[in-house]
Amino acid sequence: HFERFFTQTPEGVVPDIFNDELAVALIAENTYSVLSACSHRGITNILRTIGNCFPGYTFKLLAGGFHIHNAQDEKFSIIADYLKNNLPEQIGICHCTGIDKYALFRQTFGNRVFYNYTGNTFYL
């Protein structure tokens, strides 16, 4: 979904590929948790990269946006399929995922899914 985002370079205006996007992995007692922003590069790409760094660790928490609020349900299915095979204990979904997609995640993964928001506090 890079077609709507642009950045200024010395060569002119080009599509933004979000190569500067960040995610944070919190490591504690053989577990890892992932905090991300809107995941423009794809939450599954982020999770795969972090998961490969910590093989054998338990995936405790995913908190972030998946940026699929205007996407077809196919993108939801790709993410849901990945999560089914790499299931965290908790999934905190942020606004850019879209409330309709949040409902699908909640329906698919039940009580492990919560709606995350600015100022929310949760304990690992």
Kindly give the residue locations of the regions a language model identified:
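Flexible, acidic/histidine-containing loops and adjacent segments that form or flank the divalent-metal
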Residues: H1-E11
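Cap/insert and terminal regions of metallo-dependent hydrolase folds
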Residues: G12-V34, C38-T118
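A short acidic, often aromatic-flanked loop/helix-cap motif at beta-alpha or helix-coil junctions
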Residues: G119-L124
